[in-house]
A protein has these predicted regions:
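Core segments of cupin and vicinal oxygen chelate
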Residues: 29, 35-75, 122-125, 169-215, ...
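Conserved short beta-strand elements that form part of the metal-binding/catalytic scaffold
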Residues: 57-89, 136-144, 191-229, 272-273, ...
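N-terminal targeting signals for export/organelle localization
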Residues: 10-11, 75
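Sec-exported extracytoplasmic/periplasmic mature domains
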Residues: 52, 56, 98, 107-111, ...
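Residue-level signal for alpha-helical transmembrane segments in multi-pass membrane proteins
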Residues: 12-19
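Vicinal oxygen chelate
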Residues: 2, 6-7, 16, 24-28, 32-42, 65-68, 81-107, 125-130, ...
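Short amphipathic beta-strand starts and helix->beta connectors
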Residues: 23, 76-77, 112, 151-154, ...
Length: 300
């Protein structure tokens, strides 16, 4: 009995060790970019037409409908939408070089984390946390022996409208709280901010610490309708030439409700909407005009 009682406290202490470490004892591993965005739909067939036919991405095996943008980025659709009032965004995931170390790092910074990092359906290591506004944010470490690793270089058809998700965005109500999480703890940095007027801040681009993808805070949004949430909670696909991308969509008879335009950030963009109103923004990565409101940091 004595031995059993003496061992249990030691085992408990070992299990809790990551959470008890001082902040400086665990270094943040690299966070290199957007890994995936997961969305709700109530019509997988319509989603497949939009992401597979109109946008030209290849569907790969997985739950729901999974579309491959490149070897490190995916768009996932799940038939979970039960009401038009629901938010379509399930989560956004970022790629890290070490999921376990990142989990321990977040625990050391008093972020609630799962008990352990686990392999997901695709064989990669991943875990999720909640940001200060309750949004699910995931982190993925790609493994060479996973389903995605074994499919490296495959399912990348010439029909794809884009080769990269360059950013995702969602509604932010409390910028200071979100900054404490994304900037102060995770290491994201402001790349550009702009607004509908020169002195307003309606959009804030926060670049990942070890890459060029970014998160766009969508600020000053009050009581959004389902359509407004779809506009704000969005993803952006980089295209090298907007005119060519627009023509490809026309040739595929895609539903186009808007025309290409130059945004406040000086970049060509074209807004598309999937069957459940989530905005998919096509964007040329480089400004063709001087961005409004603030200087834009150049790519790393």
């Amino acid at each position: 009995m004595f031995r059993r009682r003496s061992i249990l406290p030691a085992l408990l202490a070992a299990a809790l060790a990551p959470a008890l470490l001082p902040q400086s004892a665990v270094q943040r591993p690299a966070i290199t970019g957007v890994a995936r965005i997961a969305l709700k739909t109530n019509d997988l067939a319509a989603a497949r037409r939009f992401y597979g036919h109109d946008l030209g991405f290849a569907e790969v095996p997985g739950p729901g409908a999974v579309f491959k943008v490149n070897d490190h980025q995916y768009i996932e659709l799940y038939p979970q939408l039960k009401s038009e009032d629901e938010d379509r965004l399930i989560n956004v995931a970022y790629e890290t070089t070490d999921a376990k170390q990142l989990r321990d790092y977040l625990a050391a910074h008093s972020i609630e984390v799962p008990a352990a990092v686990a392999k997901q359906w695709d064989g990669n290591l991943a875990f999720s946390v909640k940001d200060p506004e309750g949004r699910e944010i995931a982190f993925v470490q790609y493994l060479s022996d996973s389903q995605t690793g074994r499919q490296s270089g495959k399912s990348l058809p010439a029909t794809a409208i884009s080769a990269r998700i360059i950013h995702t965005g969602f509604i932010v109500q409390d910028r200071a709280a979100e900054d404490r999480f994304y900037r102060d703890i995770l290491g994201f940095e402001e790349m550009w901010h702009g607004g509908k007027t020169e002195d307003s801040v309606d959009w804030l681009d926060m670049r990942v610490p070890d890459g060029n993808d970014w998160l766009e805070y969508m600020l000053n949004v009050r009581n959004p309708t389902p359509k407004t949430r779809g506009v704000m909670n969005h993803l952006a696909l980089g295209v090298p030439n907007m005119e060519a991308a627009n023509q490809r969509l026309i040739d595929r008879a895609a539903t186009l409700t808007e025309k290409p335009k130059i945004g406040r950030d000086g970049k060509w963009q074209l807004n598309l909407y999937d069957p459940n109103l989530t905005r998919v923004e096509l964007m040329e990565p480089k400004p063709v005009q001087t961005p409004c409101c603030s200087p834009m940091k150049p790519p790393r």
